Amino acid sequence: MALVKRNNNMALIATEAGKLAAVKAGQVMLSPAGRELIWNGVNWVRRKLGRSKKSDVILHPGVLPGAIAAPVANTRIIRASKPKFTRSKGSVTIAHRELLGQFNNSSGLVVNGGVSGNLYRINPSNPVVFPWLQGIAASFDQYKFDRVQLQYVPMCATTETGRVAIYFDKDQQDVEPADRVELANMGHWTESAPWCESTLNVPVDNVKRFMNDNTTTDRKLVDLGQIGLATYGGGSTNPVGDLFIHYTITLFEPQPLASLVETEQSGAGAAPFGTNLVTVSSNATTTIITFRGPGVYLLALSQRAASFTTLVTAGGAVVNSHTTLFSGPAYQSIANITATIPGGSITYNGTLFGNYTLQVTRAKISNNATLI
């Protein structure tokens, strides 16, 4: 029997037995079985704590629960997304990811890069949101989204100030939020610092809808809704991040290929048709063509005019090649343009501008528009 001694409280303190127990416990902890036992216990505790409590454990000291501390640096590895096709009788299901574009910081509230007019309507025929999917969807009459998720991926330093918000609006004809109060009242909305990645799951409703390959009076019949990205509170106009859309969609009812060319016209008998790649505004001295999304475009413009003077780009648009000729009461211009961000534009200047006809389609830079 091990020797023991009595303390002032008449309690027994096991000396030799305590030392022996400590040695045995240490041996168990250092053994493979002991290490596995300990880690299993830790994982069990973490599972019981729940997700929010686990976040509290790994966040920086002094950071309140639910907050995110700014790291020295972070990044996201973006890898190629290969579309997945699943075929069934009369339909095809596609899962893919696409890039909507790059966005810049701003001091005041700027929504969708400053481009208005329900830019990001969720319809597979909308080339601004689905530049890759649109070419496939043009061969079908109906669609149904099974999953839609927005992902904001930062590309700025953690010293960048401001806020970035992404949102979903079920009514695709609502105007964009005009201030922070309207933005904060969105039913589906998430917001973070520019350097913080964020995601938003868009609710889907298992409803079959028609493609919007022509002029539709009520867009609520053809669109799932609209999405948007807003920036504010920044101290610069630096690029802050990219917006991606992840989706799973089922296409129904194959049809002859719909037009991938947009036609815009003015004057009596005008018949706009096709996709919605640009917006056009014109007066007696200028015609401005604004690109709703990034990409390379081929434009063919004919317009009545007394004279034509210059062609100017703005907002990140670049002329790759062009030919513009003036003869008599009209001028004609064909141009290959790259728009780097939503809202890039090209302006035609002259005198006594009148009716116009414009054709727009997506292209490659190698589609040279120069007259040789």
Swiss-Prot record:
Pfam family, one: Viral_coat
GO molecular function, a single term: structural molecule activity
Residues that span the membrane, as ranges: none
GO cellular component: T=3 icosahedral viral capsid
Compartments where located: Virion
Main location: virion
InterPro entries xrefs: Capsid_prot_S-dom_vir, Viral_coat
Keyword terms: Capsid protein, T=3 icosahedral capsid protein, Virion
Disulfide bonds: none
Binding partners and assembly: Homomultimer.
The protein's role, per its UniProt record: Capsid protein self-assembles to form an icosahedral capsid with a T=3 symmetry, about 32-35 nm in diameter, and consisting of 180 capsid proteins.
Family as reported in the entry's similarity comment: Belongs to the icosahedral plant coat protein family.
Protein's name in the database: Capsid protein
Species of origin: Pothos latent virus (isolate Pigeonpea/India) (PoLV)
